């Protein structure tokens, strides 16, 4: 545990697991993605873009399909959330999609360290933009493809909002029910000898209750309210177009049934890590996306396996 964490969250502090996870992954001083975490063959985990160029090439073809479906607009905006080091954008650029001449590709990433990597091997990179710069970028009419980075996403998008393996890294709570409509959650408490889980009564949003009740009583499961909020906000950013989310997932009941909370995983150096409370900021924390929690909030136009879509 870093001294920075100890200073900001002294002994006696208690927080929800969602608060803890967000800090452990994204805090600017010691968060995993803000300091040491990185995808890729030399990083801590592999996603499809890091395996090779084929995924990016197939997704480039999918972007062309969406561009044609929108009537081939003169400016076609792709906003990729959780862009990491920019590998997917580079793969799409290398594939030379037909929409490239009008493409404005914005890589949205919370981590300044990750954004600093976006210019590597990516031509026509227009910089790390503030809010005014983002609006100017997505509204521009200069020949594309053009790429830019920001921690800020625009509204009024004509194009595609894209997220590849983002939702599994959005902070979630850990809850269970007793079969009678009562819920408990795991909080994180800073005790004298380190961090520990403590159980506390809680309430869940009414829209989640039926889905969570599908799990057996007493089984811990992720409550992915942040993922649902991200999805609804992404849809609100569109004027015309689609949201494409790619991630690994399963129904809530299936996730909860895994023994010993096996769905709660950490990774470091491309290997499974230890307990998520052992050393905040030292590892990736992730879980399967509970797809039925998303569907309960927003009915998808298409939900299919990655193979079926690509």
Spans of features found by a protein language model:
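Rossmann-like AdoMet
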Residues: 1-81, 85-157
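Class I S-adenosyl-L-methionine
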Residues: 4-7, 155-310
């Amino acid at each position: 545990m870093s001294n920075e964490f100890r200073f900001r969250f002294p002994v006696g502090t208690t927080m929800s697991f969602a608060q803890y996870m967000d800090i452990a992954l994204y805090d600017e001083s010691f968060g995993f993605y803000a300091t040491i975490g990185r995808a890729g063959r030399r990083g801590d985990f592999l996603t499809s873009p890091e395996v090779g160029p084929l995924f990016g090439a197939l997704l480039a073809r999918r972007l062309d399909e969406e561009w044609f479906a929108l009537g081939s607009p003169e400016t076609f905006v792709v906003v990729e959330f959780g862009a990491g080091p920019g590998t997917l954008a580079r793969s799409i650029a290398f594939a030379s999609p037909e929409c490239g001449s009008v493409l404005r590709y914005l890589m949205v990433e919370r981590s300044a360290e990750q954004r600093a990597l976006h210019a590597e091997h990516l031509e026509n990179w227009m910089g790390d933009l503030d809010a005014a710069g983002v609006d100017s970028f997505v509204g521009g009419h200069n020949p594309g493809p053009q790429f830019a980075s920001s921690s800020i996403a625009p509204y009024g998008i004509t194009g595609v909002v894209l997220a590849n393996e983002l939702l599994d890294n959005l902070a979630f709570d850990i809850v269970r029910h007793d079969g009678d409509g009562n819920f408990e959650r795991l909080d994180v408490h800073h005790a004298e000898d380190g961090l520990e889980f403590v159980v506390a009564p809680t309430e869940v949003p009414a829209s989640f209750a039926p889905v969570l009740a599908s799990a057996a009583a007493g089984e811990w499961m992720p409550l992915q309210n942040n993922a649902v909020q991200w999805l609804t906000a992404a849809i609100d950013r569109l004027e015309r177009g689609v949201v494409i989310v790619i991630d690994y997932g399963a129904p809530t009941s299936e996730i909860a049934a895994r023994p010993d909370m096996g769905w709660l995983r950490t990774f470091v150096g491309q290997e499974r890590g230890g307990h998520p409370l052992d050393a905040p900021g030292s590892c990736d924390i992730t879980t399967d996306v509970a797809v039925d929690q998303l569907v309960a909030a927003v009915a998808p136009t298409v939900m299919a396996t990655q193979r079926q879509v690509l």
